[in-house]
Amino acid sequence: MAVAARAAAVACLLVVGLAAVAGVDGATASSPAPAPAVDCTAEALKLADCLDYVTPGKTAPSRPSKLCCGEVKGALKDSAAVGCLCAAFTSKTLPLPINITRALHLPAACGADASAFSKCLAPAPSPSVAPGTSSGSGGAAAAPAKGAAAARSPMASTTAVLVVAAAVAAPLLAFFHF
């Protein structure tokens, strides 16, 4: 029972620390972003029960738990929450090992809409070529991005990645170090 209490304490400390960092980063962003329709921190933490399923390794279960599936189905009801989770799952800066294929297929594994995270798999534009700098046929502008991710600042994506990292790290730290 003491291990569970320590795990909860570690998770709470990580969430509070990340919330403080996210608040400071959001306040110092150079361009104002509209208020998010959903709290990405809360959405990422709701999927903590999916950790054992998305963690790489031979000990990962073949199916996500019922708790995990309930959380996934709840998140899928809000397109902004799906946008937050897509940004977190597909981030190249995620510091912890996560089986991205399993993470993106959580809805299908839980019996929900298999295409829910399909937009996550769309290739991102190449960062080496800025929009409008193509030497193509006379200045065709790039089409603006659609959906919740278009309105989000880069800081929001970074915050989402940090939150998912904390949600993954807290149970692992509690399990292996306490």
From Swiss-Prot:
Alphabetized CDD domains for the sequence: AAI_LTSS
Residues excised as propeptide: 150-178
Record-level GO cellular component terms: aleurone grain membrane; side of membrane; vacuole
Cross-referenced Pfam families: LTP_2 (PF14368)
Tissue specificity remark: Expressed in roots, stems, leaves, flowers and seeds.
Signal peptide: 1-26
Compartments, record wording: Vacuole, Aleurone grain membrane
GO terms under biological process: proteolysis
Mod. after translation: O-glycosylated on hydroxyprolines; noncontiguous hydroxylproline residues are glycosylated with arabinogalactan.
Parts of the chain that traverse the membrane: none
Lipid-carrying residues in chain (GPI-anchor amidated alanine): 149
Keyword NADP: no
Keyword line: Disulfide bond, Glycoprotein, GPI-anchor, Hydrolase, Hydroxylation, Lipid-binding, Lipoprotein, Membrane, Protease, Proteoglycan, Signal, Vacuole
Lipid bilayer topology: Lipid-anchor; GPI-anchor
Residues the record marks as carrying a glycan: 99
Cited InterPro entries: Bifun_inhib/LTP/seed_sf, Bifunc_inhib/LTP/seed_store, LTSS
Main location: membrane
Molecular-function annotations in GO: lipid binding; peptidase activity
Disulfide bonds: 50-68, 69-110
This protein's name: Non-specific lipid transfer protein-like 1
Record lineage: Eukaryota, Viridiplantae, Streptophyta, Embryophyta, Tracheophyta
